[in-house]
């Protein structure tokens, strides 16, 4: 099959990559696998970090996808699906506690010891599949994974109408977080560097502020979605005493930061990663969030190298691949 392959040094299109069917056939019966024909896959910031050496991954990247089941349990054949990206072992303490996302032996689609969705087919545990409602287009469904990550915040903290929330970052993740948190009734402000991206967020009814116009003030909750050390420092300066700081993005670069404000101001710091796919699909089906305005361009998989270069440009929105 055709796939976009990362060998640790170079990204290339491989027209004869070993099919994901071999993965389905080779898995133990404990983890029943489905072979999914990929309709669309999204390039995200994590993929771009992988191309810089993050996680030491080699193989087929990609973890945001929508497709249809071509092989697997009969009841799933032909169904349009998305899939949770963490493949737990099913036997450890975390898996037994329904925390497979934190399984120490987990594989992660396109990130850790498992080929991903930048290919014609991807192999996914049946237990990880979610059926896509007919009311949700492929172009919407491909956002399920990052949208679920935004919904994870609402499972971790209690937001009430009138709470003041600041979302730092106007990129794709910041946009989705702002839209989702607005559903809580809290008062959301999005802060970013790009007027055009903030304009997209503003259309959802969220107050926006350009960084150049920022006048420091305090918020009950800060969601850090910039992935930058500067964003983290700003977040620590803007959260009220006994407020909450949600770290939604990974800051890969080494950076010295004083944690004294966390102790002095008794700040609650919460790490936040993957989230509930069912909530994301429900929101997409009910049209409570708008994701298609975030799409910049759709590339053919054969042009995947150019697509990844486009995704890495400053100001780029969501780049999709179509096998």
Where are the model-predicted features located?
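A generic alpha-to-beta junction signature in SAM-dependent methyltransferases
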Residues: 158-159, 226, 239-240
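C-terminal hydrophobic helical "lid"/dimerization subdomain
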Residues: 278-323
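NAD(P)H dinucleotide-binding glycine-rich loop of Rossmann-like/cofactor-binding domains
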Residues: 89-168
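A short acidic, Gly/Pro-enriched loop at the edge of an enzyme's catalytic core
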Residues: 214-222
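Mid-domain Rossmann-like dinucleotide-binding core that forms the NAD(H)/NADP(H) cofactor-binding site
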Residues: 136-212
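N-terminal Rossmann-like NAD(P) cofactor-binding module of classical short-chain dehydrogenase/reductase
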Residues: 82, 223, 246
């Amino acid at each position: 099959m055709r796939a976009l392959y990362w060998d640790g040094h170079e990204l290339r299109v491989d027209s004869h990559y070993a099919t994901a069917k071999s993965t389905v056939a080779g898995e133990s019966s404990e983890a029943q696998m489905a072979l999914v024909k990929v309709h669309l896959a999204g390039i995200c910031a994590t993929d771009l970090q992988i191309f810089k050496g993050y996680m030491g991954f080699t193989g087929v990247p990609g973890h945001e996808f929508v497709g249809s089941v071509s092989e697997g349990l009969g009841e799933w054949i032909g169904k349009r699906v998305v899939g949770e990206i963490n493949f737990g072992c099913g036997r450890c303490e975390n898996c037994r506690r329904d925390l497979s996302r934190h399984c120490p032996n987990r594989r992660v689609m396109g990130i850790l010891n498992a080929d991903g969705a930048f290919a014609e087919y991807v192999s996914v545990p049946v237990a990880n599949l979610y059926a896509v409602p007919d009311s949700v287009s492929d172009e919407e469904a491909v956002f399920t994974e990052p949208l679920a990550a935004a919904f994870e915040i609402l499972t971790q903290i209690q937001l009430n109408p009138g709470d003041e929330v600041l979302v730092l970052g106007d990129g794709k993740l910041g946009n989705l977080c702002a839209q989702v948190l607005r559903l809580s009734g809290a008062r959301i402000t999005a802060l970013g560097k790009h007027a055009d991206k903030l304009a997209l967020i503003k259309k959802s009814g969220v107050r926006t502020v350009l960084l150049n116009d920022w006048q420091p003030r305090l918020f009950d909750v800060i969601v850090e979605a910039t992935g930058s050390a500067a964003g983290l420092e700003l977040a620590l300066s803007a959260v009220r005493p006994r407020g909450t700081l949600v770290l939604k993005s990974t800051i890969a670069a080494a950076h010295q930061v004083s944690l004294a404000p966390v102790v002095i101001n008794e700040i609650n710091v919460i790490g936040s990663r993957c989230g509930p796919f069912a909530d994301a699909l429900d929101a997409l089906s009910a049209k409570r969030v708008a994701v298609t305005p975030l799409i910049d361009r759709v590339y053919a998989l054969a042009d995947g190298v150019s697509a990844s270069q486009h995704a890495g440009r400053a100001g780029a929105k969501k780049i999709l691949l179509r096998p």
